[in-house]
From Swiss-Prot:
Reactions this protein catalyses: ATP + H2O + 4 H(+)(in) = ADP + phosphate + 5 H(+)(out)
Organism from which the protein derives: Erwinia tasmaniensis (strain DSM 17950 / CFBP 7177 / CIP 109463 / NCPPB 4357 / Et1/99)
Name assigned to this protein: ATP synthase subunit beta
Subunit structure: F-type ATPases have 2 components, CF(1) - the catalytic core - and CF(0) - the membrane proton channel. CF(1) has five subunits: alpha(3), beta(3), gamma(1), delta(1), epsilon(1). CF(0) has three main subunits: a(1), b(2) and c(9-12). The alpha and beta chains form an alternating ring which encloses part of the gamma chain. CF(1) is attached to CF(0) by a central stalk formed by the gamma and epsilon chains, while a peripheral stalk is formed by the delta and b chains.
Compartments where found: Cell inner membrane
One GO cellular component term: proton-transporting ATP synthase complex
């Protein structure tokens, strides 16, 4: 193995000099022995003259020029397979849950090529989530990619935790969760939530949280994806959850500046589209198995035209947009039914009844949005009888789109509800057709199926 020595350290970027005939390849892993600590670097650029520029996967505190560095002659490799289930690992696949070695039988490199075009498959099967607004307005496909878009504090992580709970409890596949640059507290909550729901033995957890250096946060999504690819290649249907894809982009921005690249729009890295593409093209289903991915996407300053969320949009099959305005009304999940879209919402895929109900709900809510201005200026009395009916039904629908979550029982005090797609369609169709015009609108708030709303109305 070739050895080199550190010649420059700038934050997370470390330059290492090797003999001219033994320069490491790009993406090779290097190891630095710094006292008792072991630090892994990943080669990013060859600068010439035997010098390579690398990114540190851990803290570069205590590094100094002249330290010996060993070329491991392979990319970063992580454990894969069933041994990783129920365990918490870092970007290098090392356990961080104090439960001893992973005991894996196989390790895979985190840099892999995407499946070829002829290996890929697409399915039209729907994945029922038990969340009314998602199943009705933006249904998920098995093997599809879903983005949860929202600003700070509108409920991306809670929605994701509910999806994992529902899918793990109702559909018994394996899941991989990659925590990319999020709060350590959320990682802890997530672990305990999975343990309490008895689904921890079906989930592999990989964390590179906010306190980690940018190199770590940039690669941890690939670590999680590699574990998911192994399950897929064994012929399983696996779920991959990434929270948060924006932090992956942000880590790339931090690294890009340190590597000396010119920034592009809004200060993002010039390689933004390519970095996103490398990750997203690997998240795909093949003829052997499928990866269904759910990705939380932070939207800076609630601006969906920001380059980072805008680049992510292009890769997704379904987009769930969380709205601050809906959250401020106390309606959770705060999904915007007019902004959220899905490729699956097609009569040939979901059936005519589902399609007509979803479009009918959207047109009623859209009409209500238009009438809001008139109501604000002139009041309800100036509306025609027909418009008054539209407003009454829309307000009931808006409240019926809310739902108590299992993972939020602690906050809401009401037990979580799983609503089947059949019940969801029946409920909204009933409201649209005027079957429940006699019920007060507060009966529809925070209930599961329509029967619960009818029961609640009796108590009001």
């Amino acid at each position: 193995m070739a050895t080199g020595k550190i010649v420059q350290v700038i934050g997370a970027v470390v330059d290492v000099e090797f003999p001219q005939d033994a320069v490491p390849q790009v993406y090779s892993a290097l190891e630095v022995k710094n006292g008792d600590a072991r630090l892994v670097l990943e080669v990013q650029q060859q600068l010439g003259g035997g010098v390579v520029r690398t990114i540190a996967m851990g803290s570069s505190d205590g590094l100094k020029r002249g330290l010996e560095t060993v070329d491991l002659q392979h990319p970063i490799e992580v454990p894969v397979g069933t041994a990783t289930l129920g365990r918490i690992m870092n970007v290098l696949g090392e356990p961080i849950d104090m439960k001893g070695d992973i005991g894996e039988e196989e390790r895979w490199a985190i840099h892999r090529s995407a499946p070829s075009y002829e290996d890929q498959s697409n399915s039209q099967d729907l994945l029922e989530t038990g969340i009314k607004v998602i199943d009705l307005m933006c249904p998920f496909a098995k093997g599809g990619k879903v983005g949860l878009f929202g600003g700070a504090g509108v409920g991306k992580t809670v929605n994701m935790m509910e999806l994992i709970r529902n899918i793990a409890a109702e559909h018994s596949g394996f899941s991989v969760f990659a925590g990319v640059g999020e709060r350590t507290r959320e990682g802890n909550d997530f672990y305990h939530e999975m343990t309490d729901s008895n689904v921890i033995d079906k989930v592999s957890l990989v964390y590179g949280q906010m306190n980690e250096p940018p190199g770590n946060r940039l690669r941890v999504a690939l670590t999680g994806l590699t574990m998911a690819e192994k399950f897929r290649d064994e012929g399983r249907d696996v779920l991959l959850f990434i929270d948060n894809i924006y932090r992956y982009t942000l880590a790339g921005t931090e690294v890009s500046a340190l590597l000396g690249r010119m920034p592009s729009a809004v200060g993002y890295q010039p390689t933004l589209a390519e970095e996103m593409g490398v990750l997203q093209e690997r998240i795909t289903s093949t003829k052997t198995g499928s990866i269904t991915s759910v990705q939380a996407v932070y939207v800076p300053a609630d601006d969906l035209t920001d380059p980072s969320p805008a680049t992510t949009f292009a890769h997704l099959d379904a987009t769930v947009v969380l709205s601050r305005q809906i959250a401020s009304l106390g309606i959770y999940p705060a999904v915007d039914p007019l902004d959220s879209t899905s490729r699956q919402l097609d009569p040939l895929v979901v059936g005519q009844e589902h399609y007509d109900t979803a479009r009918g709900v959207q047109s009623l809510l859209q009409r209500y949005q238009e009438l809001k201005d008139i109501i604000a200026i002139l009041g309800m009395d100036e509306l025609s009888e027909e418009d008054k009916l539209v407003v009454a039904r829309s307000r009931k629908m808006q409240r019926f789109l809310s739902q108590p979550f299992f993972v939020a029982e602690v906050f809401t005090g009401s037990p979580g509800k799983y609503v089947s797609l059949k019940d969801t369609i029946r409920g909204f169709k009933g409201i649209m057709d005027g079957e429940f015009d006699h019920l007060p609108e507060q009966a529809f708030y925070m209930v599961g199926s329509i029967e619960e709303a009818v029961e609640k109305a009796k108590k009001l």
